Amino acid sequence: MQRNGVMECSVCHSKVVAPSPRSVSRAYDKHRSKISSKYRALNFLLVSGDCILVGLQPILVFMSKVDGKFQFSPISVNFLTEVTKVIFAIVMLIIQSRKQKVGEKPLLSLSTFVQAARNNALLAVPALLYAINNYLKFIMQLYFSPATVKMLSNLKVLVIAILLKFIMRRKFSIIQWEALALLLIGISVNQLSSIPDGTKSFGLAVTTIAYIYTLIFVTVPSLASVYNEYALKSQFDTSIYLQNLFLYGYGAIFNFLGILGTVIFQGPESFDILRGHSRATMFLICNNAAQGILSSFFFKYADTILKKYSSTVATIFTGLASAAFLGHTLTVNFLLGISIVFISMHQFFSPLAKVKDDKPAGALEPEDAQNHRSSDSSFVNMTAGAADDASHLTATDERKPLLPI
């Protein structure tokens, strides 16, 4: 039972501080610092895989067009992508369950599934937001040029940082805020060269609906990423494949509802989800599914900011590959842009830019020191079986780790 930020055991009536969003962030950071070498290796693999998948996506989208148009329904692509990810999550759950040790709670039991579903109900929020965003990507092409869409997507960097600050209680130093601003500038400088001459306001269509789509296009995916990270990390001990099963299952449901909506407005023929698809679109679906799966590892074991930097680096490598293999010319804007991006990345992840706690985890004000010592004593006694003294542990301490170290 939870009351006034404190959880009380219904059996022994001991009290423990309830985790807050900041507790989730702190606990994760402390857990991560213990496995820094594995963390760096995982980050390298995540960024490398993301660069490959993001780099392939523009090529597959181009190959999916027929006479410059899409012959398939965008919602059908999103639905098939979610179904692919659900199948992958189920397969990985089966493999993981077979490797469980004796005495561990079975992953595939009904009780485990129901309990995990309750604990991860928040994943329905990013699933809905992703469904909206994936459809919006195609809609944006109707109102803006591709270069303008890229320019607008740059605003997500700052929006994500602001949302992380308020939702995840993440703290950024002044140097890190400057690094994020540099990232925004670097990407913009790179893409300015692709905007046609004579286009005003970066090609913005001055209509009310265009501005509404712009606001949604920037806000929705940022909210989805941050809420996804919060939902995954708040249940850190739950298998990521089980969490993905819920996330992708919700996504498939929302996209299927979108298909039913198109049937109502466009007729029964739009229910054929395979209409207009080709071999290229099947590769596109697999690529999108792989990106979604990889993103879940970013959000649970890394963070949203690293994912954004990774996607930026992937775009840069795509430009370099185009110059090397397709003969495209590298502009001055591109070279200046990537230089600014790499400076931003080095600055953001530099140890000097890390936010330091105002006070160490064990530091307290002098007047609170005596109370803290009695609280620690109560906690020790509780572990020894003295449940009567455990009720002294009622002070709110957001620095208390949520995750097991």
UniProtKB/Swiss-Prot annotation:
The keyword Metal-binding does not apply. It comes from the Eukaryota. InterPro entries: Nuc_sug_transpt. The chain crosses the membrane at residues 44-64, 75-95, 122-142, 144-164, 172-192, 204-224, 245-265, 282-302, 323-343. One of its GO terms (cellular component) is Golgi membrane. Residues 65-74, 143, 193-203, 266-281, 344-405 are lumenal. One of its GO terms (molecular function) is pyrimidine nucleotide-sugar transmembrane transporter activity. Coiled coil: none annotated. Keywords: Golgi apparatus, Membrane, Sugar transport, Transmembrane, Transmembrane helix, Transport. It is a multi-pass membrane protein. Pfam families: Nuc_sug_transp (PF04142). Sugar transporter involved in the transport of CMP-sialic acid from the cytoplasm into the Golgi. May transport important nucleotide sugars such as CMP-Kdo (2-keto-3-deoxy-D-manno-octulosonic acid) in physiological conditions. Belongs to the nucleotide-sugar transporter family. CMP-Sialate:CMP antiporter (TC 2.A.7.12) subfamily. This is CMP-sialic acid transporter 4. The lineage of its organism: Eukaryota, Viridiplantae, Streptophyta, Embryophyta, Tracheophyta.
